[in-house]
Amino acid sequence: PFGSYVFADIGPVTGLPPADILEEYRFLTDTFLAAGARHFLFETNSSTEGLVETAAHIKQVAPDAFVLTSFSAFPGGYTRDGFFVEELVREVTESGYIDAVGFNCVSGVRPMKELVHLLGTCSLPVSLMPNAGHPIVIDGRTFYESAPDYFGTSLAALVHDGISIVGGCCGTTPEHIHALCRALAAGAGEADRENGQYVHAAMTAAQSPFFEALKAGEIPIAVELDPPDTGNADKFMVGARELMAAGVSAITIADNPIARARMDAAMLAGRVQRSLGLEPIPHMTCRDRNLNAIKSILLGLSAEGVHNMIAITGDPIPTAERDEVKSVYQFNSRKLSSFIKSLGERGDVVPFHVFGALNVNALHFPSQLGLAKKKMEAGMTGFFTQPVLSTRARENLRTARDTLPGAFILGGIMPVVSERNARFMESEIAGIHVEERIINAYHGLNRAEAEDLAVRISLEIAKDIEPYIDGYYIITPFARTALVARIVEGIKTRRGAK
């Protein structure tokens, strides 16, 4: 009776396995279809998960249905899941099942205009439903301060930029919509595309001697060195110099391992790069940072000339500390890799070489291989494995070599320094398995004898796994860089100092 369309409004379904997400969307859309709905709005999405399949189902049931998919993104063009809006819009547009695309929520009118510029040309009608400005919190309540007339006039101006559908999201009231209608009727607003579409100049991949050595089949050696747990990095830098003198190709720097705060891996990587000229490979976990913090660090690393990194989800925070220390986990390692890749493709950073972790000690290794393939699809170029300290790990490594063509694999070696150390790793460190024969070999040895044995065992493992790897990844125990330097020198001597 009002001459208006009625839309079935469906928010994002997240946090479930893919099959369950599709099932939930199917239930929601079938309920609306049974009630007679023929116009659907999928709003506030951060990814396309389940959307194309659901739209296809709607079209199969009701070919005349109209489907509008709306994404929520920050002004820089990235969603909270780390996807760039242009990629998301392209995916749903090319599916053929979506009738219109757009943006809603997160920001007000002017920041949302940036998304229109970033989007460029789109073959589908474009929708904008911004918030009524930025929120403020007073006495625990959220308010939006954008005046209706400003909202209406500003949004009406974007119609001149080719926007076909306009509306409001958080904080908008009937008066905001009335003001918008008045502005549209009066022809208010002028096209405001000052510089046309934003154009990002593509950056070429930086030269990385470590990565070039991988590609050339030179079997480079990377060594992990934990950052200090104080504000003094002198001992760390001395150890890095010692390893550099031994001939390592790169230093990897853990990011708050076992969820304990240490010196920031990215900042320390910049210092290593500037002070030593040794390639650093910082780890980046998803546990401690949101999208803004991650992007800031990536921009800084790019400026520092650090272009290799290991993306990992991160160890969980111990139960006893969770009241004081909160996890973030906005991403997992796959989403983080995809986000880093998109930053490079957009020209925001010099493209990174992103590596992931591969647990060769897993009891059900096929699931690890399946996960590794998904990581490669997300942009990872290779994997650093957990330490090989058992026959099972070596065989899994061989399987990985056969199963992951195109991936660079760096085989993990961790020197065992005592029987106590071996039993601790076997019993209390997730992802590590130490064979009993190795544990027993350390019985009764003093420190010097144990280190000599650690060198021999590590060199034996290095020789055994070399046919299946592209490089070595040696993990330094207890900051004993002199011990690791002996292993590095032993590997290089056996290989003819290649």
How would you describe each model-predicted region?
Residues 1-498:
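Domain-level signal for soluble alpha/beta catalytic cores
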